[in-house]
From Swiss-Prot:
Attaches a formyl group to the free amino group of methionyl-tRNA(fMet). The formyl group appears to play a dual role in the initiator identity of N-formylmethionyl-tRNA by promoting its recognition by IF2 and preventing the misappropriation of this tRNA by the elongation apparatus. (6S)-5,6,7,8-tetrahydrofolate binds at S109, L110, L111, P112. CDD domains: FMT_core_Met-tRNA-FMT_N, Met_tRNA_FMT_C. One of its GO terms (cellular component) is cytosol. This is Methionyl-tRNA formyltransferase. Its EC number is 2.1.2.9. It is an enzyme of class 2 (transferase). GO terms for molecular function: methionyl-tRNA formyltransferase activity. It comes from the Bacteria. Keywords: Protein biosynthesis, Transferase. It holds the Pfam family Formyl_trans_C. It comes from Staphylococcus epidermidis (strain ATCC 12228 / FDA PCI 1200).
Amino acid sequence: MSKIIFMGTPDFSTKILEMLIAEHEVIAVVTQPDRPVGRKKVMTPPPVKRVATKHQIPVYQPEKLKDSQELESLLSLESDLIVTAAFGQLLPESLLNAPKLGAINVHASLLPKYRGGAPIHQAIIDGEEETGITIMYMVKKLDAGNIISQQSIRIEEEDNVGTMHDKLSFLGAELLKKTLPSIIDNTNDSIPQDDALATFASNIRREDERVDWNMSAQAIHNHIRGLSPWPVAYTTMNEKNLKLFSAFIVKGKKGNPGTIIETTKHELIIATGSDDAIALTEIQPAGKKRMKVTDYLSGVQESLVGKVLL
């Protein structure tokens, strides 16, 4: 049975780790440090740590892996393979070269498209109709190693980051399970990536979350679902932030971009930079919980038609 070091952090990684524990010998898990979460700043372990602790697997949590004491400990382990999935740090070259079979990564895009830390978000924001999982050998350059296997999956119009995250997490574990035997036996035919076709999906910044109402209705719809349920697209109304969780396109309604042109029992309908509008169905006003627009409108006394979102 192969001795594997697993490196990952968020929920996306847990299905992959659970599969490895069931099928192989995971001798160590490396994840990010515990972080303060919520308004009360409660120190919270990463999801991967909870899985590892449940199975009594040693856990390493370096703030920075390079030149750390944890790195020295990992280098001393006689591992056959390193598997990473959304770890969140680049691996030092010494660690990449340490295992007998090298290091592989489970990446949530069809490489060479969407290298980087936010491939699921960016694929949806860009209006892609499919994405997938790539399993590749790791090299020093970010997400640029030889491709071992890939599997695509359709992005439906109603999908958002949350639904695609879950689908890709399961797909990643499934594809890795199928691919590992050829990696362990060293019988796979990996192929180089074409760097000329590479695109990048950098981590989402705060300024990326704001909606530009001058964009087309389709682009705004993709923007909202490409950031839902995290980190969440937002706009401002009455100089207060308004988070936008779900919406749909209303054909053939137009007006000045960002203007509320109609309200119904269930929606706020906003003009965009195209001939179609956006109907908001789930929002979170500043200082309040996430709610259906129906519930929001039941507490609003004034007419919102004509108000402008910025």
